[in-house]
């Protein structure tokens, strides 16, 4: 694998010897110019240059739409086939008949799968910055199912309203019948679909590094440039972060499939480096994606599921609430909102939300809702900034090419 793409390295060396006005370009001046351009782009953010950022964001959208329109125009047969298939599906969906029961069942499953796969992609695709959808969506869903399972002594929640809302079935099980495996089985589809989405979201770094290696070009991607610098200074790396990155790179490069599987299975912030490494050393696509899919959708998801289920099991939650109440001085005041929140959840599970005391908004749920709103807004802002910086990069590349032709 290490020898893969040897010709690509030679081609890159040749391309680095660019000639400008009859003289070879000084590598240090080229690197300095790239650094200045990168700093200029990093300053194009909404809180520093709002008008320019919004202008570049709009222009980048227009450029992307133009590129996709051109691509679709050159693939008219595929577009026509897709439109015909879409017309058949729409007709099947709206025409009355005995098939509607199957259509509704397929629609329900499709929307469920698409929802969780989409959240998984958003979590790792890195559009500006990843949206932490496990903490915001999947983790709370698993926690809610866990708390409900112990309260209802069953996981056979009525559908509908499950999964949108969880209520106890009319006939619950006996105390102590809920097992760890039954809860794992209940949330398996949601967790696996989310894991598949995260695996799909890891593909951009792989394709970027692979395309750069095959073409010999050097993409202006910070993570990829950091990866190349790390390879150049591998022997002099001293700090822990650099050694950890080198360990991941060597594991993936030498072990291959099982190295990628190990990196994907263990929650770690360095997996993007594994994708870049696989692309750079031209690891076959199915070797990379297969190991990533198995690691993230099966092994890692079961680790995360078990952790959340154990953390939110009935006796652990009761112990945590009791521990909060034991804090000297402020314990009882901190314990009260947790107790109110848990009691409100129990009432909802047993159809008692409209009965008894008026339902005031608990500050825990209020804070979590606001946290979700803030993180989603930050995610949207990061996308706007990232796309605006992409357009600024287009301008810089055009100016550089004009300078070379003079």
Swiss-Prot record:
Residues 65-77, 131-250, 295-305, 385-406 are extracellular. It is found in: Endoplasmic reticulum-Golgi intermediate compartment membrane; Cell membrane; Vacuole membrane; Endoplasmic reticulum membrane. Belongs to the VMP1 family. Phospholipid scramblase involved in lipid homeostasis and membrane dynamics processes. Has phospholipid scramblase activity toward cholesterol and phosphatidylserine, as well as phosphatidylethanolamine and phosphatidylcholine. Required for autophagosome formation: participates in early stages of autophagosome biogenesis at the endoplasmic reticulum (ER) membrane by reequilibrating the leaflets of the ER as lipids are extracted by ATG2 (ATG2A or ATG2B) to mediate autophagosome assembly. Regulates ATP2A2 activity to control ER-isolation membrane contacts for autophagosome formation. The gene is VMP1. Keywords: Acetylation, Autophagy, Cell adhesion, Cell membrane, Endoplasmic reticulum, Lipid transport, Membrane, Transmembrane, Transmembrane helix, Transport, Vacuole. Residues 21-30 have a biased composition (Polar residues). This is Vacuole membrane protein 1. The VTT domain was previously called the SNARE-assoc domain. As there is no evidence that this domain associates with SNARE proteins, it was renamed as VMP1, TMEM41, and TVP38 (VTT) domain. Residues 173-316 are annotated as: VTT domain. The modification N-acetylalanine is found at residue 2. GO terms for molecular function: phospholipid scramblase activity. One of its GO terms (cellular component) is phagophore assembly site. Disulfide bonds: none annotated. It catalyses: a 1,2-diacyl-sn-glycero-3-phospho-L-serine(in) = a 1,2-diacyl-sn-glycero-3-phospho-L-serine(out); cholesterol(in) = cholesterol(out); a 1,2-diacyl-sn-glycero-3-phosphocholine(in) = a 1,2-diacyl-sn-glycero-3-phosphocholine(out); a 1,2-diacyl-sn-glycero-3-phosphoethanolamine(in) = a 1,2-diacyl-sn-glycero-3-phosphoethanolamine(out). Residues 2-43, 99-109, 272-273, 327-363 are cytoplasmic. Interacts with BECN1. Interacts with TJP1. Interacts with TP53INP2. Interacts with TMEM41B. Interacts with ATP2A2, PLN and SLN; competes with PLN and SLN to prevent them from forming an inhibitory complex with ATP2A2. Interacts with ATG2A. Residues 1-20 have a biased composition (Basic and acidic residues). It is a multi-pass membrane protein. Residues 1-36 are annotated as: Disordered. It comes from the Eukaryota. The keyword Chloroplast does not apply. GO terms for biological process: autophagosome assembly; autophagosome membrane docking; autophagy; cell junction assembly; cell-cell adhesion; embryo implantation; lipoprotein transport; mitochondrion-endoplasmic reticulum membrane tethering. The keyword Acetylation applies.
């Amino acid at each position: 694998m290490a020898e893969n793409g040897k010709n690509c390295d030679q081609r890159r060396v040749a391309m680095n010897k660019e000639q400008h006005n009859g003289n070879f370009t000084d590598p240090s001046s080229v690197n300095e110019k790239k650094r200045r351009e990168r700093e200029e782009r990093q300053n194009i953010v909404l809180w520093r240059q709002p008008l320019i950022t919004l202008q570049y964001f709009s222009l980048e959208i227009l450029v992307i739409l133009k590129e996709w329109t051109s691509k679709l125009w050159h693939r008219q047969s595929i577009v026509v086939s897709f439109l015909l298939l879409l017309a058949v599906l729409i007709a099947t969906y709206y025409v009355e008949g005995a098939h509607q029961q199957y259509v509704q069942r397929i629609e329900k499953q499709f929307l469920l799968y698409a929802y969780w796969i989409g959240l998984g992609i958003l979590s790792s695709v890195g559009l500006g910055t990843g949206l932490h959808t496990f903490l915001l969506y999947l983790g709370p869903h698993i926690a809610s199912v866990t708390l409900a399972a112990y309260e209802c002594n069953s996981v056979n929640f009525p559908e509908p309203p499950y999964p949108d809302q969880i209520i106890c079935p009319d006939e619950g099980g006996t105390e102590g019948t809920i097992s760890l495996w039954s809860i794992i089985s209940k949330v398996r589809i949601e967790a696996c679909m989310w894991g598949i989405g995260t695996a799909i979201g890891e593909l951009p770094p792989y394709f970027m590094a692979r395309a750069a290696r095959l073409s010999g070009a050097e993409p202006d991607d910070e993570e990829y440039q950091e990866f190349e610098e790390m390879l150049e200074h591998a022997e002099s790396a001293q700090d822990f972060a650099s050694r950890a990155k080198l360990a991941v790179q060597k594991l993936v490069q030498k072990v291959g499939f099982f190295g990628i599987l190990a990196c994907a299975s263990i929650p770690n912030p360095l997996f993007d480096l594994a994708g870049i490494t696989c692309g750079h050393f031209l690891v076959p696509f199915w070797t990379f994606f297969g190991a990533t899919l198995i690691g993230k959708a099966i092994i890692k998801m079961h680790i995360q599921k078990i952790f959340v289920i154990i953390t939110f099991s009935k006796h652990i939650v009761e112990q945590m609430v009791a521990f909060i109440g034991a804090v000297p001085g402020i314990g009882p005041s901190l314990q009260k909102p947790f107790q109110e929140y848990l009691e409100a959840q129990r009432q909802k599970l047993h159809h008692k939300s409209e009965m008894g005391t008026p339902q005031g908004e608990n500050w825990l749920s209020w804070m979590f809702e606001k946290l979700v709103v803030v993180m989603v807004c930050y995610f949207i802002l990061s996308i706007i900034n990232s796309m605006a910086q992409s357009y600024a990069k287009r301008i810089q590349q055009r100016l550089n090419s004009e300078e070379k032709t003079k």
